[in-house]
Amino acid sequence: MSMNSNSVGAMWSKNVTFNNGEILLAGIPASTLAREFGTPTFFLDEDAFRSRAIAWRDGLKSEFGDRAGHVFYASKAFTCTAVAHWISEIGIGMDVATGGELAAALAGGVNPSKIQVHGNNKSLAEIDRAVSIGVNTIVMDSLYEIDRVAEAARKHGKRQAVLIRLTPGIEAHTHESISTAHEDVKFGFSIASGAAWAAVEKIAQLPDLELRGVHCHIGSQIFGTDAFEIAADRLLAFMAKYRDTYGTQLPELDLGGGYGIAYIEGETTVEPEDVLPTLGASVRTACAKYSLDIPAISIEPGRNIVGPTMFTLYEVGTVKDVVIEDGSIRKYISVDGGMSDNARTALYGAEYIAKIAQRTSTAPTAQSRLVGKHCETGDIIIRDIQLPSDVVPGDLIATPATGAYGRSMASNYNHVPRPPVVAVIDGKARVIVRRETEADLLALDVAKM
């Protein structure tokens, strides 16, 4: 699909404006940002981030009232101590999947009672730390893990609250790599195979564990509500079976995240009001169907909060005209970043738009490919895009909607230092994650031949 560089709208955060073709974030021109912070750099609209997190917090409360559980920000999308601090100020929780994500949450001031621990292969050290500090819940993902968490709880003299991650057998129509609730995946316990019920029976025999509820995550970049509705029904049916067997109802239901955002023309970003009323109706219908009280409902938006709030700013280094098989010319526009700061195109075939960031252009557009500086043919940021034919070295190029899985999946391929993250609000910009240096990379080397 060929992207149009003149698109402005759902892909850009709410405080991005345009003046004579130049991008401004909270009133600061892109050229000024580039001079002060260099390129490539992730620029984060802090006001937009806060607003989106608050919207999910308030939306959950509005829909479910006193049955609203937690909004857990999915920190895998992007985290750092500043983001964790904002989350703490806003009053929502964080979901973490590694010791590093837990460390960032704690360093940012998130109360352990608002931290939920995920992951399909938690280490013994990660489990021990989570139990010792009193996290909200640990989401069980294997029978081995149930024993490990119980052992850690005994060691620390605690009764650890846990959820069971269920795979309800749903095909959420998204990329295979980010679809997580069908049967053939590494995550969770299958309802259909009986594995989920075996996990329930195992936990019931361990007094050091408190089974608080069930969880599922059906995938990412989901725009419809059908899959969420089916998931809610299947999980509540499972909870009804638990009640019928054990004589008590599990108090919590976590329906995960996965709410889509706009990356290209024709896409829209899912807002809380687009999904929560339907989700609420589905939960109430299923609870009536199975004669259940409405449990506390939790959700886990990550990409949907941070994704639309960032753009990446690059500088063009070279432009090359290449004659392709059909005889036409494709411009290869090489920038000073690439797959080391945005791996999603290579991993998932993800699509983006891009725009000259510091000037306007009246030149006709040209068939273009935006590529990085790495020694890899697949180092492509945007495979097909119509960009002005007068793009030259020194131009700034911005790609929006890079807040999720950009910096968090960044690498040091070709020994390239990772870019910084700069938060901008009310006309002021500050670094919240500094740019790596070559000295940082070399500092990890501990031996010489």
Language model segments and positions:
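A charged N-terminal "starter" segment
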Residues: M1-A161, W197, Q205-L206, E210, ...
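Active-site loop/helix belt of alpha/beta enzymes
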Residues: S2-M11, G169-K320, L387, N414, ...
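Secondary-structure transition/capping motifs at alpha-helix termini
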Residues: E63, N111-S113, H156-K158, L206-L209, ...
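General structural feature for long, well-ordered alpha-helical segments within catalytic domains
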Residues: P29, D45-A48, R52, W56, ...
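Charged (often Lys/Glu-rich) extended helix/loop segments that serve as interaction or gating elements
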Residues: T278, R284, A288, L292-M449
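Short beta-strand segments
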Residues: A74, A161-T167, H215-H217, D254-G256, ...
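Active-site-proximal loop/turn and secondary-structure-junction residues that shape catalytic pockets
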Residues: A77-T79, G100, N121-S123, S142-Y144, ...
